[in-house]
Amino acid sequence: MKKHGVLNSEIASILASLGHTDTIVIADCGLPIPDGVKRIDLAVEIGKPSFLDVLQVVADDMAIEKVTLAEEVINNNAEINKEIELKLVEPALEYVSHEQFKEHTKKAKAIIRTGEATPYANVILHAGVIF
């Protein structure tokens, strides 16, 4: 049994398989998941698990080079945006339109669906390297 890090076997496997610049998405319960992209559905009820809880655990276990967010989060979910900025200090933040964000999700290795039910609580994490 693992003692530290991500315990969910699907998430742990995806993180272990990421190469430099590969992406994963952590999403609220409303983000459409494109056909062909692996869905890891953690949602058990509205709000559980939260987007921020899942982001924290994944970010602690992943080398992140860049973070992509929908620019709409700035005005429509300032609290989530602020928390992302606080939790992910090192990587560069990139904002794109929500439509562009959804296009980018088509290239993700996986989308982790949370129970979050607040607008634009979605993030694309771009894998970095540990050296």
Curated annotation (Swiss-Prot):
GO terms for cellular component: cytosol. Pathway: Carbohydrate metabolism; D-ribose degradation; D-ribose 5-phosphate from beta-D-ribopyranose: step 1/2. GO terms for biological process: D-ribose catabolic process. One of its GO terms (molecular function) is monosaccharide binding. Substrate binds at D28, H98, Y120, A121, N122. Keywords: Carbohydrate metabolism, Cytoplasm, Isomerase. It is found in: Cytoplasm. InterPro entries: D-ribose_pyranase, RbsD-like_sf, RbsD_FucU. Coiled coil: none annotated. The active site is at H20. Pfam families: RbsD_FucU. Belongs to the RbsD / FucU family. RbsD subfamily. This is D-ribose pyranase. The gene is rbsD.
